[in-house]
């Protein structure tokens, strides 16, 4: 299913996120509506772009159907973050680069805070993503990055950063794509099958496992994903699943698809839609969701080089919920 087509046919809207910036590509936007009603989006900007040969893949790059294109003299994959404010028509009003604290010298080739989800907890704004540049092996941990937003001058600065450990033992290689629960401060869905809920304590810098229980058993790993946002008596989120493989020439390739997840108030996964695409591209990624006037705003990117907001009509969301609640593996 092409979700954009269905949404637009039912009165929804697809809006690109476009603004001037210092790097090469805009990707993986995370939308959030704050306590004051402002529609905010954190957008990842990178110094590279992704080329992916689509459809029948008649025009691969010299390196295969999927290739990262970056400066020849700097093969690092660098990320910066921008904060954008939209009006209700989903047009860009303001944008600015997030000024990050200079706390360390990056020592791995993935540089910066990647795929950050935007939330407001305890009246503080956070962008929460993975950072992999603090060790020579590229170990990844989610980081809780507190930002201060001056809405008069439209400037944004990082004011505090916590590197979030996993529940003991904190020995895994790469943690990423935890899904923040929008109205439960410092709580995340770490895994979807079984559902693992974890809570980080900023005061003592530790993470505990809140619960671990099996809900629906997806036939593919469901990975984050957007925030969990309130919808009726429960929550909705978007997860992704991916097939990573090599083609007949042993060149790497991949296909990403998404699903709508339905959660009850106890954070049980009770519904899972059929897989869908946004725009029928093979490489797509959704990291943001927000409710606006009964509709669901979804922020996503295509091929790591263009960012969009999809206003999904509430009637279509309800259709997807019915489908999800009737999930059969």
Regions found by a protein language model. Give the residues of each.
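Short, surface-exposed coil-to-beta transition loops
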Residues: 26, 112-113, 284
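Conserved beta-strand position repeated once per blade in WD40 beta-propeller domains
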Residues: 28-30, 115-117, 177-179, 225-227, ...
